[in-house]
Amino acid sequence: MDITKKKVIFIDMDGTLIDTVSGKTFPEGVWDMKLKMEVFAQLKKLHPQAVLIVSNQGGIELGHVHPAMFQPKFIYVIACLQSYIGLNTLVAGQFCPYNDKKHPKRKPNPGMLEDMLAEFTHNTGITIAKEDCLMIGDASGLEGQFSNSDLKTAENFGCDYLDVTEFTNMELPEPLFKVIRLSDGEVVKDKDDNPLQNLTESEATDKVVFLTESNPKPQKQFTYVPMLWEVPHEPEQAPQPKEKIIRMNPKK
């Protein structure tokens, strides 16, 4: 399995993206958390099209956790991961507040994964096959773990799986990038008609600086994106670019 080619990564939250400060398996409260930056760093090296957090939170239905207290914590984890990875990878999440094991969205049932992949396709127009997805979690049925629900979720959904410890111990290559035009998302070619892709971040940065200085017109702006990035469809009711560029100058 080559995880550098996985376009969508589903990932558990408790014990995977975050740990308890108290050291207990389950948090004593919404405050009992710390980010697992070693996992964040590995995800950034992969730069998939999306990282989608899927989390069982049956304690909400049981009355152990108030949803008004949990939701800001969930949003905080999503925002931290989005900020760390960068804007070219979508970060989103869904949690199941129900404790009923038969509920279609409670892991190991694949409802959350099915929903989020469908929503990703709806919002971007990009179809991702299940074999191009990966699930990462800490409930792998290994010795000392409380269950195998994350592993079974991947099996029920139909994608590959990695335990979070195995994931963090992997030697991953540095991510590669391609240079695109902002106007249409197409890969830029050099003077010899070779696409500017499979570049390190420093190489991609140098290319963008050179192209921008050589083509100062606004319609010739460039940027670099991860190799797995694809052009999403245009959102509904998107404003159309004006033929004439209007510059706003402050009053003196």
Predicted regions and their residues:
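Alpha-helix N-cap and loop-to-helix initiation/capping positions
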Residues: 27-35, 65-73, 107-108, 145-149
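Conserved Lys-Pro-Asp/Glu-containing loop-to-beta segment of HAD-superfamily phosphomonoesterases
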Residues: 105-148
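Acidic, Mg2+-coordinating phosphoryl-transfer loop and its flanking beta/alpha structural elements
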Residues: 134-173
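Short aromatic-glycine-(Arg/Gly/Cys) micro-motifs in beta-strand/loop hairpins
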Residues: 173-196, 211-213, 222-226
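Short, mixed-charge low-complexity intrinsically disordered segments
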Residues: 194, 201-251
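Active-site neighborhood of HAD-like aspartate-dependent phosphohydrolases
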Residues: 1-52
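Substrate-recognition element of Asp-dependent hydrolases with the DxDx(T/V) motif
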Residues: 39-74, 89-102, 136-139
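Short, electropositive alpha-helical surface patch
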Residues: 61-84, 106-119
